[in-house]
């Protein structure tokens, strides 16, 4: 493992012993790229190191305003320009739609071709795209709908009413939190440890909620992530 640190940015490159040290200034064993590439103009030394690392796993830690988005998009453009990957081999994931749109716009300005073949988006957006493409294997209808937070709460309230659940003892909002927490931990109802009667009831309702969603062809945000993971 090689660790580089400078003001505002840290770069950790795993399995660095697989490559000669001189590759860290941008050379690639198969396709030697030019350090004079227009893509690298305006980058500082630390950003340039991060952009031109050889293929492998790298962790870049940087604070606010240090140019993380610029480094990431330039890294993608660099890999494409040097022929190390094809557009379909790129996946860039972020937390917000705004950041995803910014990355797409920057790459469109950098590259001479359409960037639609790349996988650029939020975690939920990319999971949605994956499940749409493989809905049969995922056990979903092609036209499955996504429940937002309010939709999910409404679905749980409907379930509680149907099965005469005591909503003072099991508030619907808390049930949605319980279900979301289980999914974040990768747990289906059968995987949830049952330690007391209340948890047992919550797990039963979780299973009923899953059955309801499956019948209606809908998924919540947690389901997008969990089903993609299972796929």
Feature locations, PLM:
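N-terminal pre-P-loop "Q-motif" helix
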Residues: 40-54
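Glycine-rich phosphate-binding loop at the start of an alpha helix
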Residues: 44, 73, 222
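Walker A/P-loop
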Residues: 56-74
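A sequence-level detector for short glycine-anchored, His/Arg-bearing signature motifs
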Residues: 47, 65, 96
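Well-ordered alpha-helical segments embedded in enzymatic catalytic cores
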Residues: 46-49, 75, 227
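A basic/glycine-biased coupling hinge at the interface between accessory DNA-binding modules
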Residues: 5, 11-38, 55-59, 77-231
């Amino acid at each position: 493992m090689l660790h580089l640190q400078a003001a505002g940015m840290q770069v950790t490159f795993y399995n660095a012993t697989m490559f000669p040290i001189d590759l860290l200034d941008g050379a690639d064993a198969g396709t030697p790229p030019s350090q004079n590439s227009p893509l690298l103009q305006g980058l500082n030394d630390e950003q340039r190191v991060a952009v031109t690392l050889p293929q492998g796993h790298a962790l870049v830690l940087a604070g606010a305003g240090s140019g993380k988005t610029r480094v990431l998009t330039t890294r993608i453009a660099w890999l494409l320009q040097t022929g190390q990957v094809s557009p379909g081999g790129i996946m860039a994931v972020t937390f917000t739609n705004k950041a995803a749109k910014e990355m797409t716009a920057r790459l469109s300005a950098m590259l001479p071709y359409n960037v639609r073949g790349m996988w650029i988006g939020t975690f939920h957006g990319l999971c949605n795209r994956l499940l749409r493409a493989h809905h049969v294997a995922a056990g979903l209808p092609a036209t499955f709908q996504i429940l937002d937070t309010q939709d999910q709460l409404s679905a749980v309230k409907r379930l509680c009413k149907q099965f005469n659940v005591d909503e003072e003892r099991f508030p619907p909002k808390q049930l949605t939190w319980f279900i979301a927490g289980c999914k974040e931990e990768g747990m289906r109802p059968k995987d949830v440890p049952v330690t007391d009667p209340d948890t047992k009831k919550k797990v039963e309702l979780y299973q009923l909620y899953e059955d309801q969603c499956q019948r209606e062809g809908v998924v919540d945000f947690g389901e997008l992530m969990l089903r993609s993971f299972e796929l």
